[in-house]
């Protein structure tokens, strides 16, 4: 269907068009908008999650006027989404200003969808619950709470976990340990155990539920068999029977689900909960979302033949290989295998089982003695050498081997070497001039056996930095987060201007190097326009024939006419480095937009470096996966803080954490006479007073 027809259909939503069908059409068109990824995909993903929920609500409101119903706000937001998708599909590639504006509008629409789910929908549900309780003869929520206060034991009988076999299956030892580790991770709320039919999914989670560590962590463990055709009303009926209430008929599955959610919230007061949903089919993904409620110490474990990537991390239970099958058969014949308690530990090197009495403990990780080897000589590192051994991102070394080991060419007998001041990697001096690629982001040289990526302008990028290298679309959320960051510092930037990623040739044409002595590569430029006017610097005198002579004029920039037109940043850099550079240039923009021109060069560059350093510090404490505000309608409705995740996908890696420290170290140890001296001077001023007082002092020292 053409996008114009979709927009027309959306506009007629209030006239009776099926809401779920409108959702699907807008979703289909949003996925086709390529110029606004990943925001358009986030919008489509949000609407896909809303379809099953609001389809049920719409059915319940049949015969009512949608224009005055509870879905009015949703319908209006849907109209905005349809219009915006229509506009985005027609935008030209060169319309940078419109693209930035539309990006923010898409983000606002997405937030409005979430706000409806997180606030208004919750109030609607609460009202429906009160109405339902009155129909059952319950006076108030407190009456219901009294009935639920002592049902913890009865409910555990209803959802009792089957007793495990006395003999522990040999092939479940490792999966049991790995699944328990995944479930216990902080921040993990849901885990999906996925495997083909008859591979032992239910057996595995049954063992897990009876594990001593799991029982200690979760005070209440409930096991629900979902199957292909789940009966939500039946579950609700059984719950009512166990609290002594009459099992009234529900109007529909939605009423039953609302009751189950309320019951889980009440049970949450009795302690931590592990809810196991066994044998969930692909058609019931919407049912899983309904069990996602905000409770402390509440986790969900799902078994399925399918994967639910939007629901949570997946644990893949793998089939046995031939050797394991033979071993399993022999053990089952004996039926004398002891229980898995305590579990075996895994070697940090070969990732196989290791006994405590036959292992070496290195910083809390057990190793086979033969697996803890030197990267240079391939010989084991003895126990008495552990205290002096060297361990870094390239491997583990004997101290004597490390002092002679080149991490580039693997030469084991270097007579002289260079060492990187931050990464502490030693290499032959010849690699500085023999054409060995150096990453333009982290400055590490390319080791033999790896392959750095070469950008179109000749720069090199290592594999780690390349994973989070940003393109223009991915920079837009970072740009808006940066504006929020400045606003949080009471330095709001009112003017809208685009952020553009460009090649290095364009940047070097736009701006000369400030530190010519140090040959700094220009990585960004704040473009601005300044009104130049001529003013009289000295009064004229009258000469012969009454002619005016000696009238001197000089050009003068009119500050209040200054405009920032764009920020240009070198393309191909990872998110952390791009963000630091953007913070630096945004400070230049703030100064110019507020009329602060012709400042002391060292102090101006210094305050810009301080802002970049402050932003990097905010990233040091950022939590992983903060881009999940569109992943679930049950998440918090507050705006995502400026401290976002390091990578494009939102996951923090060990390298991301190290790269933050590297960028901060680059600023702190810079020896250039402008950037380096400027940072240290201004940073000391901020430390001794405040950011706002430092700004006043810089403006005073024009």
Curated annotation (Swiss-Prot):
Residues 345-416 form the LIM zinc-binding domain. Residues 178-305 form the NB-ARC domain. It comes from the Eukaryota. Residues 630-649 are annotated as: Disordered. SUPFAM superfamilies: P-loop containing nucleoside triphosphate hydrolases. Residues 630-647 have a biased composition (Low complexity). CDD domains: LIM_DA1. GO terms for molecular function: ADP binding; metal ion binding. Residues 1-155 form the RPW8 domain. Pfam families: DA1-like (PF12315), LIM (PF00412), NB-ARC (PF00931), RPW8 (PF05659). Keywords: LIM domain, Metal-binding, Zinc. The keyword Acetylation does not apply. PANTHER family: PROTEIN DA1-RELATED 2, PROTEIN DA1-RELATED 4-RELATED. This is Protein DA1-related 5. It comes from Arabidopsis thaliana (Mouse-ear cress).
